[in-house]
Amino acid sequence: MKEDNCLHAALICLGMLYYSHAITTEKLNHVRPSLHGHHEKGKEGQVLHRSKRGWVWNQFFVIEEYTGPDPVLVGRLHSDIDSGDGNIKYILSGEGAGIIFVIDDKSGNIHATKTLDREERAQYTLTAQAVDRNTNRPLEPPSEFIVKVQDINDNPPEFLHENYHANVPERSNVGTSVIQVTASDADDPTYGNSAKLVYSILEGQPYFSVEAQTGIIRTALPNMDREAKEEYHVVIQAKDMGGHMGGLSGTTKVTITLTDVNDNPPKFPQSVYQMSVSEAAVPGEEVGRVKAKDPDIGENGLVAYSIIDGDGMDMFEITTDYETQEGVVKLKKVLDFETKKSYSLKVEAANVHIDPKFISNGPFKDTVTVKITVEDADEPPVFLKPSYIFEVQENAASGTVVGKVHAKDPDAANSAIRYSIDRHTDLERYFTINADDGNIKTIKALDREEIAWHNISVFAVEVHKQHQEAKVPVAIKVVDVNDNAPKFAAAYEAFVCENARSNQQFITISADDKDDSANGPRFIFSLPPEIIHNPNFSLRDNRDNTASVLVRREGFSRQKQDLYLLPIVISDGGLPPMSSTNTLTIRVCGCDSNGSLLSCNAEAYILNAGLSTGALIAILACIVILLVIVVLFVTLKRQKKEPLIVFEEEDVRENIITYDDEGGGEEDTEAFDIATLQNPDGINGFIPRKDIKPEYQYMPRPGLRPAPNSVDVDDFINTRIQEADNDPTAPPYDSIQIYGYEGRGSVAGSLSSLESATTDSDLDYDYLQNWGPRFKKLADLYGSKDTFDDDS
């Protein structure tokens, strides 16, 4: 209310000032003539100067926001040629002429008819001209002048933002800059103090202050603590007129938040923590949690935990949960209640980030004692070893002891233990175990060549607490004994040329032994003693587990003997050694001069494929029998085909209706044999025509002939079908091409019983009733009218 009264008084003063200014302006804002020399010759050759009148303008001023009842006098235009007789007319044009500014064309007085606002427009440019009232002839050249709107203090200061937000670290020194606020005033800064602003603080003292000229807000108190108060609300005022009475003002709100610094150390809320853990807990299991409180936030409140002392440093560890800022105590090793029942730890909590400016507030850490009690647990039996490996010879007698496992009860009760084999790991039941002492024995003989390692699992359970069990893996290795004789590494079959030279090598053989390498190689190759001096072939042991077979003589002949069987004895290096006699089949073949095979006994190739002569004959016989069956089946099927021309009692080989409207020939009038449709096998894409002679004549169909050895049954059948389909001599030797026009329309229209019944015709179709069921539909269509009437 006080500000409104002051504003009202100021406006009254400005109005009085304006009135006096208007009178002065009327006196001063006159047009004065200015003489410009113009040369003109006079009498006696004198040069006379003729006066040319011109305009010399001063700026006009008009005060803004005038609200009086009468138009404001801006100024007066006057020319010295105006004698006051009313012959001169003043004309005003330009910005706002006739709308805002009007002129009295006789006196030249200019008035403002509307209230002006300098903040909308500060000046107007107008043009004045004096003309003859009667002729409108210009008496003076037009000239421009400016009307300036004079400012008054009618706009309060305005801040750029209605609300400001700023941050400043807690415990900042006095005078620390927080934020700068800025206000603006729409009034003319070049005229008076209307736009001269002064800042002051209305709310927020004594914590903050503001610089009057710049608007910079600074801290005013030291050691402001965020933990005590985090947010402050400050109100800043900007006042024009240099802050003097009568000036206008505006305000803004500033929210200032104290940001955190690490000025507080972590503190444990208690001096001792009590925890307990079962001895059955596994390493890595959580035992408990501790937490030190730090009022700081963010990274300034981060705390790291560590164990710095205690008798449980080797048994426990502590990690930091950064989400909850807790220290998590975890088990590091397996506990034993019977060995140690309690532990003590000294845990330290320290800040991760320390601000050097506040190091004097330290130390930024705290310690606490953690006492952990171990609880007794009913533990399962424990094997003395984590795994067992035993050996047993293959082919050992049933009941042979393989080895012994042993487990004990770790509890003080020391309960009795019983053992068993996990049968899922011994499905064939090769082993058994003594339930009382843990001795593992064989049940049946083992074969290393079948299974070299047996991996089983053994359970140990307490007699009185069978839910407590332990499991241990047992690996049993079957030790090899030399129980397999060596044999040929492959099914060898050798070929020797008829022209082979003496001592010529023609094959190299090797051996294989299922036994272990200790009982296998080195292999020894030899001929049996009874044929050590074989006249045809010799054997050479290469001493690298291979042997070469050589020709001892020349002159082999297939006509005399084309097959030789050479027994070879192979011995291994085991103790005792094992040996076997293997027979090598040698074929005599014809070869060229280079030793390449040209021809050989067919049986050799058959045997090379693993087939004997008898087997080959049986296979060929089966193939021939199958071919004969297929050929007979095809022949019988063709003979049993329904004839294309059916001679039955009910078959009618005459015309029912003669369709000769289009001048058709014999093919159009001959009846169609229904048997053709009944036998679709006789119809294919190739349809012979009666009116077209075949381009070539088919030979008489040959009879069945024996198929060649390489016959393809599928090709044979397809060939026969093709011949039957394309044979023009086979019935029907007729064309059914006319039936391909079905559906293309007919001039005869559709057949119906109604139309036929009403047709005037001499034909009698009653005989159709005697043709049997096959022609019943036709008889119904062409029945007599009386019959039709009776039926209807």
Swiss-Prot record:
SUPFAM superfamilies: Cadherin-like (SSF49313)
A Gene Ontology term for the protein's cellular component: adherens junction
Membrane topology, record value: Single-pass type I membrane protein
PROSITE patterns per record: CADHERIN_1, CADHERIN_2
Signal peptide region: 1-22
Gene3D superfamilies recorded: Cadherins (2.60.40.60), TCF3-CBD (Catenin binding domain) (4.10.900.10)
Free-text function comment from the UniProt entry: Cadherins are calcium-dependent cell adhesion proteins. They preferentially interact with themselves in a homophilic manner in connecting cells; cadherins may thus contribute to the sorting of heterogeneous cell types. Required for proper focal adhesion assembly. Involved in the regulation of cell migration.
Protein name: Cadherin-11
Source organism per UniProt: Gallus gallus
